[in-house]
């Protein structure tokens, strides 16, 4: 899950 910088996670959620 998100434990470090949730940068990629957020980008994927936003759908880039």
UniProtKB/Swiss-Prot annotation:
One GO-annotated biological process of the protein: negative regulation of translation
Leader sequence residues: none
Keywords: Antimicrobial, Fungicide
Top-level division of the source organism's lineage: Eukaryota
Function according to Swiss-Prot or TrEMBL: Possesses antifungal activity against B.cinerea, M.arachidicola and F.oxysporum but not C.comatus and R.solani. Inhibits HIV-1 reverse transcriptase and cell-free translation.
Protein name (database record): Beta-basrubin
């Amino acid at each position: 899950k998100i434990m470090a910088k949730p940068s990629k996670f957020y980008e994927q959620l936003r759908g880039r």
